[in-house]
Design a protein with these regions (language model features):
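N-acyltransferase acceptor-side catalytic subdomain
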Residues: 1-199
Length: 199
């Protein structure tokens, strides 16, 4: 891997096949879970009642793609992280190509939380999120869903399912069903085309 990063064409090619990387003990491991976590972008998406109250207070300014690297580093702060230097540089390279994006929660004290992920076809692959202040990552997730709906996306892939994501309507589907859905979302999308820089 040149310069210690996963080449963008390799990374996007993996996503197109339902595979994603995680770092462990200095190695890059590749995963394709038998049960895949997704958050439906239709009426099944649910905002928990307590979070609705927080949203009404508008505690953060939401920004997109203004601090991608900082969001990644925030996600890497927690113990047992799978985000190492290779992962950071690899996704920053995708971000420069317009294929990886961040959602950020800011206040007067700075960046307080957010998330990042990869966009391909009508699918968005959520990678990781973090919070420095209460509800920041949850509010970023709601902002992401709103933006994905506006842009015509139909799949939010969370990779793994957690109790936290279930509160938003997250579900698990089998690998076969997921791959069929993914191919539908990528119809007409070319990994080669997606690597062309915007004019």
């Amino acid at each position: 891997m040149e310069y210690g990063i996963i080449p963008p064409e390799v990374l996007l090619g993996a996503y197109a096949q339902g595979v994603f990387p995680m770092a462990e003990d200095g190695e890059i491991l590749w995963f394709s879970p038998t049960q895949r976590g997704i958050i439906p972008l239709d009426e099944r998406f649910h905002i928990p009642r307590g979070l609705k109250k927080a949203l009404r207070k508008k505690p953060f300014e939401i920004r997109f793609d203004t601090a991608f690297r900082e969001v990644m580093l925030g996600c890497a702060e927690r113990d047992g992280t799978w985000i190492d230097g290779v992962i950071v540089e690899s996704y920053c390279a995708l971000h420069e190509l317009g294929r990886a994006h961040s959602v950020e929660c800011w206040d007067a004290d700075g960046l307080q939380g957010g998330l990042y992920g990869v966009a391909l076809g009508k699918a968005f692959f959520g990678e990781s999120m973090f919070s420095r202040k209460t509800d920041a990552s949850k509010i970023a997730l709601v902002a992401l869903v709103e933006r994905l709906r506006e842009r015509g996306y139909e799949l939010l892939d969370t990779q793994w399912m957690t109790d936290h994501l279930r509160t938003f309507g997250g579900i698990e589907i089998g690998r076969k069903e997921y791959l069929e859905l993914l191919q539908e979302m990528l119809r007409g999308e070319s990994v080669i085309d997606s690597l062309r820089l915007p004019k």
